[in-house]
Amino acid sequence: MATEKVFPMTLDGKAKLENELQELKTVKRKEVVERIKIARSFGDLSENSEYDSAKDEQAFVEGRITTIENMIRNAQIIDAAEAHNGLVTLGNTVTFIELPDGEEETYTIVGSAEADPFEGKISNDSPIAKGLLGHKEGEEVTIQTPAGDMSVKIEKITAS
């Protein structure tokens, strides 16, 4: 039997997934069923684009529900405050300066299930996070990214 993939995440990340799951099950599912019902009333389903679109959306919603249920079932909750031992760990917020230009960037390292670069949350599987994990404040680190090597100095690590 294959082992299930573990999804490391913060309590906040798990709560967001639970909220999304609740929304999908109680609101989106009903909306899609209603769209299918309306589209069926148009008659011939063989050339009914509204029906096809609603069925596609239903498949997406059901797939997302299954994915989220799996993530929640296999969640490994990370307590950043507990794990923070002076080293960059999952759940930490890290501020670093790109060398040599001095551009400052701040990211929170989270599990892939809750990553959102637009909110400054990067996956622990991303090249930047992989390069920062296990290092401490004041360290200069070379991070290998698809665009090439990037040198940074870790300025601050905080538990999120």
Curated annotation (Swiss-Prot):
A molecular function (GO) term: RNA polymerase binding
PROSITE patterns per the UniProt record, alphabetical: GREAB_1, GREAB_2
Organism, as annotated: Listeria monocytogenes serovar 1/2a (strain ATCC BAA-679 / EGD-e)
One Pfam family of this chain: GreA_GreB_N
Superkingdom per UniProt: Bacteria
Function: Necessary for efficient RNA polymerase transcription elongation past template-encoded arresting sites. The arresting sites in DNA have the property of trapping a certain fraction of elongating RNA polymerases that pass through, resulting in locked ternary complexes. Cleavage of the nascent transcript by cleavage factors such as GreA or GreB allows the resumption of elongation from the new 3'terminus. GreA releases sequences of 2 to 3 nucleotides.
Record family assignment: Belongs to the GreA/GreB family.
Protein name, UniProt field: Transcription elongation factor GreA
Gene (UniProt): greA
Presence of the UniProt keyword DNA-binding in the record: yes
Keywords per UniProt: Coiled coil, DNA-binding, Transcription, Transcription regulation
